[in-house]
């Protein structure tokens, strides 16, 4: 050899000698090999890594690490190693100078090693300067150097022990020093250095230890052990969780996706970049078909007419996350190659057992090789998984962030096509699909690679017969393809049904109070169940398909093996199936099983993700609002004195619709107060929306000068403290804040709220009255100190005296905003004389414009309307003249001059009380208000008072009762049948493999085996029986899962609908939506699959242990201890894993709640230009959720590494005992034992993963059961006490000593109410805010049950009858008109009790017949979500039509005509008088004018009746009622 002269002077030392290294009982390497290869390998490794590592470090500077003792020691040791290496070199030169001839290797190797040690020392310092705390490159270098040195050390020790060998003392001593220093360097490299200077983790109160963990800690996931130990000792809480790594936060991830999406959109459309997330330009070109886009969202699967216009979201995701994700390719490729080391070593091991002359050390060497290969495979595999899961987490974060940002800027038309339910599904289900895909997508190339490698090795082992197996696999490809296509179809249908169900559930939860008041729960329950039935039909088809899929996937590897063995033994009698061929092939078939099984799952996952990808792309491509359509000028712009200029502008809500506003032209000077008036639906609110750029400008010019504040018609309140709602992101300036509170009449409210302005308002302002919500909304606008104020009827929901106070102190000529430009949409005529300009709207156009006096002098439509209406009212109600004390036209004129129109018609001035407590939800606050007033000493104002309950995480182990509940939901027969079929399957599998081992041990006679046909037939029969059992259990589990899912959903839905209102008032809707979306999806899709995999893994592990014990009984010594370690590690892990899953579920709800809240208030957020703040809040909530998710995925890896090490130990001992017992074992048993042990690692890993998955997913059942077992309201029907069908006939209502409280720990909000209302009487209920007005109504409907006393209606105590029996017989027209998506007819008559004629009659009486008749679909007109395609006034009229249709003896009105114009108001009042003439009418009135002609009035204060009598009598008493009338300007 060429190296002989290089290694020794006489050429006697070869590089390699088989007789020295292999064919010997005492193996060693040659001296030449030791001095060259073992020295050069670490050097070549470091020099090969250096250029790439240097480049990486130069681009990734994490900061500067100060010199530490660790760093100084490593550097010093590096120099010492250099000195030691070159000491050898100088010694060689010294020897040469003495005439001793040395081979060149003694000069080259020390030189190379010395330079390498200098390089290593340089890298140690470079890493320090670049902030690397622990280096994998250097640790690997020292490990390789040590392993190479270890082989040399063994050789030197063995040489030294020989007596007749001469020892080179100096070189031996330097080597021992070198070995010791390398060992110390390796140990030091296992530790991590301190954090770099200026590192962000220094300022983080709870940083993730991963960034400062050592390389060894990172690859073994040791750094999370502390958290797992803490979780084992006590349940983990949110405060225990670490901050996210910076690269995983929304702040880092989302902007990159946003930027790449913009580029892709621009590139695809071949036009300038359209900003998708920053509300600059529309996402689609103006000439694109918006209708097509909407249809696509609805159908989800229709093809785009112009494919070239569709940007590729997949490309964007790949560009954003690809670079990091590509590392997983590297790890996966290494793992796939290493997978085949097991069967190859198994072949060597079987050959070793068969070769009785082979030295024992070879068996131990193979055993060690098998163990090391398995351990390396474990570490590589879980680095791969870690990268995949982190990538998935980042994708989910980015998708949620992108969807949230898009939702802030899409047009109103796009909002209608993408409902809240669909958008929530994009954030929950679809984002989860991307996460799942990240884990599996590499299998697209990895599975075929594994199949090719396995087939290659099988060909080497068995030859051409393997083609029979290939044929079977090829036949299965079209079967899998058909199933994948079918799966996609079912997936699309399933997602559509799920969207519809979530959308409807969202509406039900938002309008639950209305459902309860109308007793409509059953109708809507049936609607949900009908959608759910369709969903379950699709799920059932998917389950059958999955069962067929499982059957083919499990049977395919066996069929491949059977066909291959059958062809092998039949084509040639001399082909003997010995242990090596059978079990190496079987090991390869087992490897083949995974890619063949996983590929259909991957295809399914890709199919699901492609559906989600399309849905997401359609949503992100929606049209956006164009804020640039309105010119925004700074206040300092002195060129124009007008604050608002609109010239010939036309606006529409959707480009496909006709314009809503036509030819609008007006200018408003700075500081002017402008009123906008007109009938319902004439475009008043649309005008404000147009100024806010909420509408699509078709033509014209709009310019605004300065900042804008907006008070919407329906007050939007956040689930936050009252103070935060007012500040709305601004800094607190105490004096100004106090003046705003006072001007908005909130001071009295702060005094009675439990924690003052720190009181948490609750979701949608649940514990504030309508008036309080509107005043908070107003205060928010005032506090922001804008230049232009847009008020959409802000005084509608407040009492007359409060309205007067607000107008005088805030909006009016002398108010806080007197120098600001104000536009006030109003129906109240009383304020018009004080405004500068009045804009009169009619049919989407400005019909008149001018000051109050100018419009009267012009004698146009406006003046005619005022005169006609006033005189008509006077003629209608002459008795009111006596009340007010003045009569005739003179009075009207005088009041007009004074700016107050206070005749009875003025009393019925149109106010919109839309915001007043979402269908009475605000009355909880009235309870708290009066309670606090009665118990002022009880309120602790230091702490924020909270009404809403956060989603709580359960702690501890999931109770067995949860599993039992799930089994009962499946059905006990199906449950036990599934277990039986699982056992049958695995018994058949064990029997077939044992039979194969017996077959391989059959004696060979004349070059062939006897009984081959019998062996083959039995082997085939066992395989077929296994397949039948697989199909059986798969069907049983799938059907059982659907039965359980149906049962749990019905229980949850029924329970939620049966819960009292107090439950909804304290439970955020996000929690409930989460249950019906994510948790139910887990029960639908995840749990059945997890059960199948858990049961399979459990029986596989048991089977493997049985086989190993049968083959090598000595393994009984080691398997129990390993089992204990396994059990301990698993218990250790599950305690933390379970709690992390719960924390993740709990932190997910606020993401949805915040998102829902944002969608409801998106116009306010945009008006105040607070998008960035809300985006930041959303990002923080998503990060908070990922803070719990990230440790859970790392904990999974932590567990898997440790358990696979236990599995690797089983492999080690199975092989070791086989080597020890090789003389007493047959090759067949060794093959069976080791091939099963090779699978144990995978089985153990899957078993623990599936057991933890089972426990973490069963949490979904626990969380569904949690809300299925909440408190319930009284029964809906009680047969024994059901009232007669014609009850109540008279309508007499008696309150006898009636007391009401909202919770046991609170005081009464109604105290000892004793009053009798005779049938047919019209009774008004008045009182200040918090007096208990609405509480009385809630008591009447038994929304809250009485604490003491009773209510008697026509002689029947209402507490003794069913709630529906009561609520069907009483009708309410609520303050807030709530409509549901569906037909108009359904909104009027969900039970279809009435004929079309009766419905049309009710519409006619409600003055809606003309409007509905003009609609294309008439009664089948589809109402949008929340009735958004009807004006607020029209929605209120629909509520009136409901009441007219029901025509019950008792009618409750809560300012029912607040949102209609004066003319319609008059018509409605007369309808109520005529149609409900013989009915008992109770009216809660903020405005006393509406009840002046009533029979009697109840005056409430602090929950007690203070006055009761006819209005005229109460005025004469000059008490509370008189004072209220005086404040309202009635006396």
Curated annotation (Swiss-Prot):
Residue sites binding ATP 1 per the record: 678-685
GO BP term, pick one: positive regulation of inflammatory response
Residues listed as glycosylation sites in the UniProt record: 19, 1006
Residues where ATP 2 binds: 1327-1334
Residue numbers bearing the Phosphoserine modification: 289, 905, 915, 930
Keyword hit for Ribonucleoprotein: no
EC number: 7.6.2.2, 7.6.2.3
Chain ranges of the ABC transmembrane type-1 domain: 325-608, 975-1256
GO cellular component: basolateral plasma membrane
Protein name listed in UniProt: Multidrug resistance-associated protein 1
Gene that produces this protein: ABCC1
């Amino acid at each position: 050899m060429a190296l002989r002269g290089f290694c020794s002077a006489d050429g006697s030392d070869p590089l390699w000698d088989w007789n020295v290294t292999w064919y010997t009982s005492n193996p060693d390497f040659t001296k030449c090999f030791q001095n060259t290869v073992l020295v050069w390998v670490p050097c070549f490794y470091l020099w090969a890594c250096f250029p790439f590592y240097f480049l990486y470090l130069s681009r990734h500077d994490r900061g500067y690490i100060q010199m530490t003792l660790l760093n100084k020691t490593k550097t010093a040791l590096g120099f010492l190693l250099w000195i030691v290496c070159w000491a050898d070199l100088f010694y060689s030169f010294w020897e040469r100078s003495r005439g001793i001839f040395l081979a060149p290797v003694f000069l080259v190797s020390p030189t190379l090693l010395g330079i390498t040690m200098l390089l290593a020392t340089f890298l140690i310092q470079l890493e320090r300067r670049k902030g690397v705390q622990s280096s994998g490159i250097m640790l690997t270098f020292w490990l390789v150097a040590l392993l190479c040195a270890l082989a040399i050390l063994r050789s030197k020790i063995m040489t030294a022990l020989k007596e007749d060998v001469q020892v080179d003392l100096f070189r031996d001593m330097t080597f021992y020093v070198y070995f010791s220093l390398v060992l110390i360097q390796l140990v030091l490299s296992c530790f991590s250095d301190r954090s770099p200077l200026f590192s962000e983790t220094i300022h983080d109160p709870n940083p993730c230890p991963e960034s400062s963990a050592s390389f060894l800690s990172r690859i073994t996931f040791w750094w999370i052990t502390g958290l797992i130990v803490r979780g084992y000792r006590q349940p983990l809480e949110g405060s225990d969780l670490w901050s996210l790594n910076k690269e995983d936060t929304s702040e880092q991830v989302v902007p990159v996706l946003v930027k790449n999406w913009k580029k892709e959109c621009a590139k695809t459309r071949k036009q300038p970049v359209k900003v998708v997330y920053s509300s600059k330009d529309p996402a689609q070109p103006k000439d694109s078909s918006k209708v097509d886009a909407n249809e696509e969202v609805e159908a989800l699967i229709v093809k785009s007419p112009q494919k070239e216009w569709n940007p590729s979201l997949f490309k964007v995701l790949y560009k954003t996350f690809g670079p990091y994700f590509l590392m997983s390719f590297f790890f996966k490729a290494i793992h796939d190659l290493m997978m085949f080391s097991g069967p190859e070593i198994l072949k060597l091991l079987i050959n070793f057992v068969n070769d009785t002359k082979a030295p024992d050390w070879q068996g131990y060497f193979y055993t060690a090789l098998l163990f090391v290969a398995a351990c390396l495979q474990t570490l590589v595999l879980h680095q791969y998984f870690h990268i995949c899961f982190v990538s998935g987490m980042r994708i989910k974060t980015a998708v949620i962030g992108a969807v949230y940002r898009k939702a802030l800027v899409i047009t109103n038309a796009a909002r209608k096509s993408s409902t809240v339910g669909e958008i929530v599904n994009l954030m929950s289900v679809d984002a989860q699909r991307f996460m799942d895909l990240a884990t599996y997508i590499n299998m697209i190339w990895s599975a075929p690679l594994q199949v090719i490698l396995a087939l290659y090795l099988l060909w080497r082992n068995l030859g051409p017969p393997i083609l029979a197996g290939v044929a079977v696999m090829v036949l299965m490809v079209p079967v899998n393809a058909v199933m994948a296509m079918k799966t996609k179809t079912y997936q699309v249908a399933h997602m559509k049904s799920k969207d519809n169900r979530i959308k409807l559930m969202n509406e039900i939860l938002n309008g639950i109070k209305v459902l309860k008041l109308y007793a409509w729960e059953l109708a809507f329950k049936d609607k949900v169940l009908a959608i759910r039935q369709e969903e379950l039909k699709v799920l059932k088809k998917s389950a059958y398909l999955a069962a067929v899929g499982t059957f083919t996937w499990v049977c395919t590897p066996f069929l491949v093996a059977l066909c291959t063995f059958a062809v092998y033994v039949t084509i040639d009698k001399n082909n003997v199936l010995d242990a090596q061929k059978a079990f190496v092939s079987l090991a390869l078939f087992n490897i083949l099983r995974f890619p063949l099984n996983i590929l259909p799952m991957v295809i399914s996952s890709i199919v699901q993700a492609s559906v989600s990808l399309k849905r997401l792309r359609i949503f992100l491509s929606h049209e956006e609002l164009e804020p640039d359509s309105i010119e925004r000028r700074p206040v300092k712009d002195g060129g124009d004195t007008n604050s608002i200029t609109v010239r010939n502008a036309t606006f529409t809500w959707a480009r496909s619709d006709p314009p809503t506003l036509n030819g609008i032209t007006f200018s408003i000077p700075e500081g002017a107060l402008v009123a906008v008036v007109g009938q319902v639906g004439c475009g008043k609110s649309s005008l404000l929306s147009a100024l806010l750029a909420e509408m699509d400008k078709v033509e014209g010019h709009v310019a605004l000068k300065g900042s804008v504040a907006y008070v919407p018609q329906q007050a939007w309140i956040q689930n936050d403290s009252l103070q935060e709602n007012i500040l709305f992101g601004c800094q607190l300036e105490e004096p100004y804040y106090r003046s705003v509170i006072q001007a908005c009449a909130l001071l009295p409210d702060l005094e009675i709220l439990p924690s003052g302005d720190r009181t948490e308002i609750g979701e949608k302002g649940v514990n504030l009255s309508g008036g309080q919500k509107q005043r908070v909304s107003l205060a928010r606008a005032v506090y922001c100190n804008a230049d232009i104020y847009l008020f959409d009827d802000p005084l509608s929901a407040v009492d007359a005296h409060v309205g007067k106070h607000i107008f005088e102190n805030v909006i009016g000529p002398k108010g806080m905003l007197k120098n600001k430009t104000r536009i006030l949409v109003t129906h109240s005529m009383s304020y018009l004389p004080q405004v500068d300009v009045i804009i009169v709207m009619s049919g989407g156009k400005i019909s008149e414009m001018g000051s109050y006096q100018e419009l009267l002098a012009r004698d146009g439509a406006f003046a005619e309307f005022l005169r006609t209406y006033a005189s008509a009212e006077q003629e209608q109600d002459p008795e009111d003249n006596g009340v007010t004390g003045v009569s005739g036209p003179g009075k009207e004129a005088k009041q007009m001059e004074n700016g107050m129109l206070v005749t009875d018609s003025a009393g019925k001035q149109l106010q919109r009380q839309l915001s007043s407590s979402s269908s009475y939800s605000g009355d909880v606050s009235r309870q708290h208000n009066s309670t606090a007033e009665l118990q002022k000493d009880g309120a602790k104002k230091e702490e924020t008072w909270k009404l809403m309950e956060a989603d709580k995480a359960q702690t501890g182990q999931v109770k067995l009762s949860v599993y039992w509940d799930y089994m009962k939901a499946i059905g006990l027969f199906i449950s036990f049948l599934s277990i039986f079929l699982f056992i049958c399957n695995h018994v058949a599998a064990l029997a077939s493999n044992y039979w194969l081992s017996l077959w391989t041990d059959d004696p060979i006679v004349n070059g062939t085996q006897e009984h081959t046909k019998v062996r083959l037939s039995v082997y085939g029969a066992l395989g077929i029986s296994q397949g039948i059992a697989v199909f059986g259990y798969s069907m049983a589990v799938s059907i059982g899962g659907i039965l359980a899912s149906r049962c749990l959903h019905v229980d949850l839905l029924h329970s939620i609908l049966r819960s009292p209102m107090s439950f909804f008032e304290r439970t955020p809707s996000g929690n409930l939506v989460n249950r019906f979306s994510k948790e139910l999806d887990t029960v639908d899709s995840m749990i059945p699959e997890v059960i199948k995999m858990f049961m399979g893994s459990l029986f596989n592990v048991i089977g493997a242990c049985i086989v190993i014990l049968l083959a090598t009984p000595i393994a009984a010594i080691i398997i129990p201890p390993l089992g204990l370690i396994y059990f301990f590690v698993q218990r250790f892990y599950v305690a933390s894993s379970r709690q992390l899953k719960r924390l993740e579920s709990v932190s997910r709800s606020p993401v949805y709640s915040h998102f829902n809240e944002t969608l409801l208030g998106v116009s306010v957020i945009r008006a105040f230009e607070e998008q960035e703040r809300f985006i930041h809040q959303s990002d923080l909530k998503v990060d908070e959720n990922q803070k719990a998710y990230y440790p859970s995925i790392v904990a999974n890896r932590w567990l898997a590494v440790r358990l696979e090490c236990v599995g690797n130990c089983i492999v080690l001992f199975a092989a070791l005992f086989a080597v020890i017992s090789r003389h007493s074992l047959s090759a067949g048993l060794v093959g069976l034992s080791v091939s099963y042990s090779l699978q144990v690692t995978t089985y153990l890993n899957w078993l623990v993963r599936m057991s933890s998955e089972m426990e973490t997913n069963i949490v979904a059942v626990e969380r569904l059961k949690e809300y299925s077992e909440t408190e319930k309201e009284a029964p809906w029907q009680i047969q024994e006490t059901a009232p007669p069908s014609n009850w109540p006939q008279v309508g007499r209502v008696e309150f006898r000593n009636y007391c009401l409280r909202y919770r046991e720990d609170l005081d009464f909000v109604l105290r000892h109410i004793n009053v009798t209302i005779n049938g047919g009487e019209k009774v008004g209920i008045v009182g200040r805010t918090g007096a208990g007005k609405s509480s009385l109504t809630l008591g009447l409907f038994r929304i809250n049950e009485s604490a003491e006393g009773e209510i008697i209606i026509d002689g029947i105590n209402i507490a003794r009858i069913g709630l529906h029996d009561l609520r069907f017989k009483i009708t309410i027209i609520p303050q807030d008109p709530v409509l549901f998506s569906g037909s108009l007819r359904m909104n009027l008559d969900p039970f279809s009790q009435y004929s079309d004629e009766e419905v049309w009659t009710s519409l006619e009486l409600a003055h809606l017949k003309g409007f509905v008749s003009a609609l294309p679909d008439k009664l089948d007109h589809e109402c949008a979500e929340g009735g958004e395609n009807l004006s607020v006034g029209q929605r209120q009229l629909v509520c009136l039509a409901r009441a007219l249709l029901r025509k019950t003896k008792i009618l409750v009105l809560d300012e029912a005509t607040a949102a209609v114009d004066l003319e319609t108001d008059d018509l409605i009042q007369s309808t109520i008088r005529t149609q409900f003439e013989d009915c008992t009418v109770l009216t809660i009135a903020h405005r006393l004018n509406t009840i002046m002609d009533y029979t009697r009035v109840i005056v409430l204060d602090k929950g007690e009746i203070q006055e009761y009598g006819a209005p005229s009598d109460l005025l004469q008493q000059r008490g509370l009622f008189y004072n209220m009338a005086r404040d309202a300007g009635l006396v």
